[in-house]
Amino acid sequence: MSKRRMKYHSNNEISYYNFLHSMKDKIVTVYRGGPESKKGKLTAVKSDYIALQAEKKIIYYQLEHVKSITEDTNNSTTTIETEEMLDADDFHSLIGHLINQSVQFNQGGPESKKGRLVWLGDDYAALNTNEDGVVYFNIHHIKSISKHEPDLKIEEQTPVGVLEADDLSEVFKSLTHKWVSINRGGPEAIEGILVDNADGHYTIVKNQEVLRIYPFHIKSISLGPKGSYKKEDQKNEQNQEDNNDKDSNSFISSKSYSSSKSSKRSLKSSDDQSSKSGRSSRSKSSSKSSKRSLKSSDYQSSKSGRSSRSKSSSKSSKRSLKSSDYQSSKSSKRSPRSSDYQSSRSPGYSSSIKSSGKQKEDYSYETIVRTIDYHWKRKF
């Protein structure tokens, strides 16, 4: 470059720098449109970047990509709370202040990515993301950077296989003969096998398509197909869920088995108890019936004893009556005979017989027998 042209560029840079300083602490709009367009307070102007205090965060723009900065004269008095701002001499040093923090590269578009900054080379920065794992960004193509709320999922992960190379060319050499993804999206995005060529150029081979690329024009590169890291993570989560489901199912089945065993035991014990209670009730009923039978037998025996005693007593009474009647009848038979015999022997025998003819009829043998029969029948 000629001295005149260098002087022209230096003069333009000085004038542009002075122009930016004149708008410091004013409300401006960076970019007039597109995903990178943001409105806020211009808080810092550095050699190759500016700091814009937006509504919720501070955005650091690399000056070589800023196409326009417009002052908002209508809202020049609007106050925006200023957060703590990083202070660095240049954009590369600014990125170095954000190592191991959650950041966002670019505010929108296909090359916008959020993740944890894990490494910084001379001309690239390595960002650990959820979707693509570690992505290597060419610093020359980063339009803006801002702090982002930490993603717990990313914070808990330890990135594996981070290429800690000095520059982007060494990163490309490490990724040769591997499947890589060039750029995050848009018409320039491509996937394929990276093949090394002479003169610092590389070739991407995908099926029948062969493309020659130069690392300087690559915005970002990552190992493997795009989204493979997220798919692998989802697969691991699904496997984990399946294992948890299996464990829970096995626990439920073992629990149901133990509950069935306990229910069987309880049923068995209830059957034993019922059988025992049945036996006890049967034994009680049998004892009761035996007691009743004993009582009834005792009662019957007592009744039979009473009846036998009553019968025997009645028989004995009958016998006694019969014997008494018989004795009385014998005595009565004998008495008239004896009386007759005595009367016959006495001197007044004939006269007495004549005088007491009626008594002779009353105390005859037949009269006595009839009298006994009458009284016997009447009594029994």
UniProtKB/Swiss-Prot annotation:
The gene is cotB. Residues 224-364 are annotated as: Disordered. One of its GO terms (biological process) is sporulation resulting in formation of a cellular spore. It comes from the Bacteria. The keyword Cell wall biogenesis/degradation does not apply. Residues 275-288, 296-315, 338-356 have a biased composition (Low complexity). Residues 229-248 have a biased composition (Basic and acidic residues). The lineage of its organism: Bacteria, Bacillati, Bacillota, Bacilli, Bacillales. Keywords: Sporulation. This is Spore coat protein B. The keyword Cell cycle does not apply.
